[in-house]
């Protein structure tokens, strides 16, 4: 090849091709697994500082910790232990549990009780909790009895110590998944990942973009009525 300019151009093309093939920052990676009776999924670009296996291990460990603190489906979880206390009993909550509950109580106050994490007795009565499913509506007297046990204002959280007023059954399902999503996002950012999409049971958090700078897109199930 006698044309030095053409030779140089071909070298540049070859170099660019090899670089593109080795560019992990433009590659979409995905991790997933089961959690909280549903599934979790993390999509990201780039390479985690300690590698993908270490990131997945950290994610699974974090989700397990949240389950052990806030899952009413685990009889030995912190929330189940509180729900089983006699009136006047107290429990020192794990720090994440205390933070989530404090946020939930703030939301209850801001909405004048429209949002209330003590609604567990009604959730269970209608068959949406850890109790066996039911296929008929509960009796009116059972509904009223369950309602008497509901009321966020009954709770007293002193720093991390929560006192059981008697009969209160906490259910953090409406907020725990969102907290877990934020927790996983923090793990990704700590690992040097700034472009990601985290999803747990329909709860989402996104940052940055997909490869080639494309925006993250999520599907909405049956967005059109009917």
Predicted regions: what they are:
Residues 2-11, 15-226:
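Mature catalytic core of soluble alpha/beta enzymes
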């Amino acid at each position: 090849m006698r044309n030095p300019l053409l030779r140089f151009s071909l070298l540049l093309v070859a170099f660019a091709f090899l670089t593109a093939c080795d560019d992990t920052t433009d590659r979409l990676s995905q991790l997933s697994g089961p959690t909280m009776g549903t599934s979790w999924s993390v999509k990201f670009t780039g390479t985690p500082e300690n590698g993908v296996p270490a990131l997945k291990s950290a994610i699974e460990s974090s989700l397990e910790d949240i389950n052990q603190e806030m899952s009413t489906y685990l009889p030995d979880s912190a929330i189940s232990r509180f729900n089983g206390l006699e009136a006047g009993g107290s429990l020192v909550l794990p720090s994440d549990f205390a933070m989530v509950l404090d946020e939930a109580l703030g939301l209850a106050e801001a909405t004048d009780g429209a949002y209330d994490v003590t609604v567990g007795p009604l959730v269970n009565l209608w068959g949406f909790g850890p109790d066996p499913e039911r296929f008929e509506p509960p009796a009116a007297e059972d509904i009223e009895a369950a309602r008497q046990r509901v009321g966020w204002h009954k709770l007293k959280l002193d720093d991390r110590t929560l006192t059981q007023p008697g009969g209160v059954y906490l259910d953090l399902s409406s907020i725990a998944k969102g907290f877990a999503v934020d927790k996983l996002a923090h793990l990704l950012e700590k690992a040097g990942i700034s472009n990601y999409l985290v999803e747990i049971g329909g709860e989402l958090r996104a940052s940055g973009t997909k490869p080639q700078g494309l925006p993250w897109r999520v599907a909405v199930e049956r967005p059109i009525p009917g």
